């Protein structure tokens, strides 16, 4: 006899269960000899697919259930347990869950629409009808109970979880004949052991935002029970046990996996194969005409026809047409589309359709890396859009294909070690002092298990029982979903209504959102498309618009020359601040040494600049400039690896090596590459045997083929997707081109993008200064909500470029206030003077906002001192209330006294987060000159220099030898850099070191782990 558990609530009943749907759970069920069990989460089905597959993997029959909170007609809670008897019932459960998530309140009448194929259990302790029965209100009970008779299979669920449960069962048994009841045994599970009960209560506290949780519904009995315990518990009621098996036998859902359920492009086009072919051929002709490459038409057609044949055989014609359609719509509506992403640019068909912007033949890209008949997977065409236009494209797709066929995808924020400990500390009221010390250690580990061997960790928790308990709880809740959110890019599309494949819930911007995660949806064969919002595309778009507006020049970034000498000179100088993919300090250092002069060079650097391959960069550079000879493991590798100086840089090279040495098709070679990259021993050995055998057929001896195979295995993880490297290098190049030829517009937009980062602001302002462009403080008459470029006359009367700091960048001046100020300025003209400003903005700004506008320099144009404007603001405000009578009042006298320099500097720093006009170091200009001090931005690697700076932060540590040393953050008002003082030097100067004091430091700049730092040799305080 088996008690089939029909009431397991998983971790996906968020913050109400610690039952994890993982392999450990599957093992527990298997060890208990369980043949069937059910998931029954509340209102949602987030975990249904995971549960289904987990059960199948352990030879357990999965029963898909759903607990629904129903609208009550009396004063009792009203819950019902529903189970899918067949696939129709499964779809109906998804519809009911969608309805519950969308409409919040579900009535019994709503159930009737979706009762087919569904079995219903009324749990005695949770059903309103059952509570009416137990209260002796039989007339009311009968009225409610009869409503559920729409279900062919209707049961009363009886449990023994709590006191007085036997008497409840006897009460129901006594009226069994009268009401023709069918009963079934229930045992609710929300945690797996007594140890997990505390974790369960903790999750309830998090959910309820409380520091304590008192069980009121017999929760202390909701733990998992083994079969022998359940059989013993229900031994007096064998019919309740038998009924669980009876229900299990009635529930037979078989979910289909692996078969694609792709949407149709259009019902009006009957022959999508021909339509796609014609579009591609037309697009190819247009591409070749523009590039002057018509002589190679036959070669391109051969490749195109080969690709289209594979696309058609695999049933993806509609997929390509759908992507083509929304890309075409985007371009037609002035939305910049990225040149490509991932492996999609490897397809000539994508290039012909305008989906991507690079010629795969020109760059030797392999279609099989993207799609092949040997690898039965969905093609993955990810598309990049400006982050402020992405939603417009999704809205178009939504409107074109329908609300029930397009949806966002759910994703879950799960507990990591830090998040778990923080929530536990908050609930348990553990002082920050203690938990923060623990978090400092945990911060470097991905799980509690990984950190348990750390000596400091062990000592800390052994010294503090509260921390020890917190860690114990954290281990239990780690990995459990804490909240649901929306996938950053993914959108799901189907031909039929989505609710036939996945339960839904409300999503963003009027779209639905799937309850199933992306991994579950892909297993179901549903089409996921990634619409990525890229800030860099927004910047490019905005720069182009500004150039058009100010210079009347129209730029198409997809038509700019890709061999512009000046652009590559800028890149080779490492002046790539703000350039996508190339802006980090370490990358800029590599660029200055490698000096790329074409797109492929940029792709090489892009591919190599990652942990692992980065180690090969010095040798790569030496080989490029002929300072080191290129060597090959075998002469036959030369034609494949010569372009990359004998180094495997790209995944495609691994595929070509497998083709060359073992006769693999490129599709087979890609499968090999994917297999060996996982480094599983049994896979490696199996693939080695196959590779060596195939290699022998081509005449290579086993010693050579084994060496080549080892070579492939070594670099399988290092290799980068060539098409992705090329397209993202082109995107970076496009930004570099704009920076080279339209510097002021580029920098103004980069500054607008990075306004929330003071460090970036300092870096960009410093860069502009080097190019002769001054960044001016905000101006109430010329600044807007972004950085704006203007022409202004300098002291010599020459017109120069300047960039105004935006009003939105002033602290305490919010977006709504800026909007209202700009509307006032637009409607009624520039502000004439201080009194005009106060009068016209008195309903927009208060004294605090006005003060920060003054501190920032935004009102300097009025010719008054900042101190006078702050002091006289309220008097001017009061005067403005007199309207036309104010002319009869005495004129306001404005004193000429100004704040001291240090005050001005501090006020400006408070208002803007940095100094633009009143850099505190300006007063030390003579000192800077005397000691020949350099700005931080002027420091050269390994060159000893003097720096005039402030110590922003100072932290001392002790070495293993118990010697003191210090780490610092240094600033010169424009840039910041880390500093380090080693023990010997620190002993000599430590008595003069203090935060927020100004010093002349002597030291040399070094680059370690991609970060610059100054090794300080001496210091004196000013």
Question: Where do the PLM segments sit?
Answer:
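Domain-core and long-helix interface of multi-subunit machines
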Residues: 2-39, 43-58, 98-194, 237-239, ...
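Noncatalytic, beta-rich nucleic-acid-contacting surfaces in large DNA/RNA-processing enzymes
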Residues: 4, 35-39, 55, 191, ...
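Glycine-rich loop at the start of a catalytic domain that most often binds anionic cofactors/ligands
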Residues: 18, 45-60, 197-201, 351-361, ...
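Hydrophobic or amphipathic alpha-helical targeting/insertion segments
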Residues: 44, 48-104
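Short secondary-structure boundary/capping segments
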Residues: 53-55, 136-137, 171-173, 198-203, ...
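Acidic, His- and aromatic-enriched active-site or binding-groove loops in soluble protein domains
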Residues: 62, 66, 82-87, 181, ...
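Active-site or pore-adjacent capping/gating segments
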Residues: 80, 197-277
């Amino acid at each position: 006899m088996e008690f089939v558990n029909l009431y397991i609530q998983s971790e996906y009943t968020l913050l109400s269960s610690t039952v994890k749907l993982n392999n450990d759970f599957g093992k527990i069920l298997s060890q208990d000899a369980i043949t069937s069990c059910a998931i029954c989460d509340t209102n949602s089905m987030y975990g249904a697919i995971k549960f289904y597959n987990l059960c199948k993997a352990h030879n357990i029959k999965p029963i898909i259930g759903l607990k629904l909170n129903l609208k009550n007609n009396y004063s009792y809670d009203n819950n019902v347990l529903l189970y899918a008897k067949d696939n129709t019932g499964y779809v109906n459960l998804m519809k009911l869950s969608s309805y519950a998530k969308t409409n919040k309140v579900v009535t019994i009448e709503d159930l009737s629409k979706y009762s087919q194929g569904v079995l219903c259990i009324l749990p005695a302790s949770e059903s309103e009808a059952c509570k009416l029965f137990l209260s002796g209100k039989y007339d009311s009970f009968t009225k409610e109970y009869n409503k559920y008779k729409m279900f062919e299979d209707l049961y009363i669920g009886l449990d023994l979880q709590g006191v007085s449960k036997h008497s409840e069962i006897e009460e129901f048994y006594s009226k069994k004949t009268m009401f023709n009841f069918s009963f079934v045994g229930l045992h609710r599970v929300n945690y797996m052991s007594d140890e997990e009960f505390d974790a369960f209560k903790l999750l309830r506290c998090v959910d309820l935002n409380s520091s304590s949780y008192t069980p009121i519904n017999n929760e202390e009995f909701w733990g998992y029970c083994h079969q022998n315990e359940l059989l013993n518990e229900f031994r007096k009621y064998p019919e309740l046990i038998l009924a669980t098996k009876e229900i299990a036998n009635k529930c037979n859902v078989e979910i289909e996996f692996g078969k694609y359920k792709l949407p149709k492009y259009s019902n009006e086009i009957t022959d999508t194969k021909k339509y796609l072919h014609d579009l591609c051929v037309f697009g190819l002709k247009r591409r070749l005409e523009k590039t002057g490459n018509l002589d190679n038409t036959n070669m391109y057609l051969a490749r195109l026809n080969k690709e289209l044949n594979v696309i058609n055989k695999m049933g993806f014609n509609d997929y390509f047409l759908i992507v083509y359609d929304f890309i075409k719509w985007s371009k037609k509506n002035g939305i910049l589309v990225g040149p490509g992403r991932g492996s999609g640019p490897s397809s000539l068909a994508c290039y012909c359709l305008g989906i991507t912007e690079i010629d795969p033949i020109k760059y030797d890209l392999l279609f099989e890396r993207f799609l092949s008949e040997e690898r039965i997977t969905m093609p993955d065409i990810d598309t990049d859009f400006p982050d402020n236009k992405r939603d417009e494209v999704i809205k178009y797709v939504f409107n074109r294909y329908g609300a029930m066929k397009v949806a966002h995808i759910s994703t879950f924020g799960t507990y990591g070690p830090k998040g778990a400990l923080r929530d536990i500390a908050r609930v348990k009221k553990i002082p920050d002092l203690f938990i923060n010390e623990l978090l400092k250690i945990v911060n470097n580990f991905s799980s509690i298990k990984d950190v348990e061997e750390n000596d400091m960790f062990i000592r800390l928790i052994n010294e503090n029982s509260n921390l020890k308990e917190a860690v114990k709880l954290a281990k239990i809740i780690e990995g459990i979903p804490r909240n649901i959110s929306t996938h950053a890019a993914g959108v799901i599309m189907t031909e039929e209504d989505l609710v036939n494949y996945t339960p839904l819930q409300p999503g963003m911007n009027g779209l639905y959102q799937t309850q199933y995660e992306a991994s579950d949806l892909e297993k179901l064969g549903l089409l996921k498309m990634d619409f990525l919002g890229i800030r860099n595309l927004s910047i490019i778009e905005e720069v182009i618009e500004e150039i058009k507006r100010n210079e009347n020049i129209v730029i198409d970034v997809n038509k700019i020359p890709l061999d512009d000498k000046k652009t590559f000179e800028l890149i080779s100088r490492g002046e790539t601040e703000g350039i996508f993919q190339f802006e980090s300090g370490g990358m800029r250092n590599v660029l200055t040494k490698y000096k790329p002069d074409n797109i492929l060079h940029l792709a090489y650097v892009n591919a190599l600049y990652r942990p692992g391959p980065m180690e090969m960069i010095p040798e790569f550079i030496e080989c490029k400039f002929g300072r080191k000879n290129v060597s090959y493991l075998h002469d036959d590798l030369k034609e494949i690896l010569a372009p990359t100086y004998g180094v495997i840089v790209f995944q495609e090279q691994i595929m070509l090596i497998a083709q060359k040495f073992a006769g693999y098709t490129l599709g087979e070679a890609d499968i090999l590459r994917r297999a060996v990259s996982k480094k599983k021993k049994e896979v490696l050995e199996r693939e080695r045997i196959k590779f060596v055998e195939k290699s022998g057929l081509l005449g290579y001896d086993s010693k050579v083929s084994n060496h080549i195979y080892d070579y492939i295995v070594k670099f399988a993880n290092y290799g980068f997707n060539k098409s992705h490297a090329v397209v993202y290098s082109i995107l970076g190049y496009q930004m570099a081109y704009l920076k080279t030829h339209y510097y002021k517009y580029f920098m103004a937009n980069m500054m607008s993008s990075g306004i929330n980062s003071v460090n970036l602001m300092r870096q960009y302002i410093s860069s502009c200064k080097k190019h002769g462009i001054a960044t001016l403080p905000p101006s109430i008459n010329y600044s807007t909500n972004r950085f704006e470029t203007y022409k202004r006359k300098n002291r010599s009367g020459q017109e120069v470029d300047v960039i105004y700091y935006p009003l939105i960048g002033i602290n305490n001046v919010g977006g709504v206030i800026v909007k209202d100020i700009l509307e006032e300025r637009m409607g009624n003209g520039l502000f004439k003077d201080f009194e005009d400003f106060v009068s016209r903005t008195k309903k927009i700004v208060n004294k605090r906002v006005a003060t920060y506008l003054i501190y920032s320099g935004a009102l300097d144009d009025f010719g008054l001192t900042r101190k006078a404007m702050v002091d006289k603001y309220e008097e001017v405000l009061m005067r403005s209330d007199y309207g036309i009578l104010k002319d009869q009042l005495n004129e306001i006298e404005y004193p000429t006294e100004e704040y001291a320099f240090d005050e001005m500097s501090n006020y400006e720093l408070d208002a803007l987060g940095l100094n633009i006009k009143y850099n505190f170091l300006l007063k030390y200009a003579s000192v800077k000159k005397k000691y020949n001090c350099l700005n931080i931005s002027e420091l050269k690697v390994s060159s000893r220099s003097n720096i005039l700076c402030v110590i922003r932060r100072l932290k001392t540590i002790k070495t293993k030898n118990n010697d003191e040393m210090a780490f610092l953050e240094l600033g010169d008002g424009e840039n910041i850099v880390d500093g380090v003082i080693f023990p010997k030097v620190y002993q000599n100067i430590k008595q003069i070191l203090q935060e927020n004091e100004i010093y002349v430091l002597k030291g040399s700049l070094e680059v370690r782990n991609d970060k610059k730092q100054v090794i300080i040799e001496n210091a004196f305080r000013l």
